[in-house]
């Protein structure tokens, strides 16, 4: 789950504004388990409504339901996820070591949740990262230094246009900065050390983890 990132997502739903999404998420996160569990679901809320009864599909296969997660960026959201008993999804838009305080906020809140959303606590953090792992170490590093990899950042800047970005941030379709410079082994090592990427052979990647 999440509040949405960028006008491409938010404006699709009747012009939803970023300032509205926190309250809307608070409403919907508690309703998702009910949608899974009930065949005669209805809801009347401040941000949205389902005049009922409706059988919301699809439903989880078998007993129970999947773990519930929320995409997190700031410390408050990490702590809120922990307090609600749901998992936190983190992204490496900055050096991965900077997330230490946010992970601690999550774990502290998860130790004594004020509420459990759903049937069970999902006390986990999932963190995304770029990974290039090959038996051939040099080939993995060659791919990591390729110019095309930089297009990921330009796409993030395009679609996540409601998030702050650096003044020198480049947005697609403009060519990424990586096409203007020749990546060196030293530069790649700095990226790996900062936690922006895992790269190398299986032994190296395991060590980086």
What are these regions (language model features)?
Residues 1-3, 68-71, 86-91, 123-129:
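Hydrophobic faces of well-ordered beta-strands that scaffold small-molecule active sites
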Residues 61-67:
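A local structural motif
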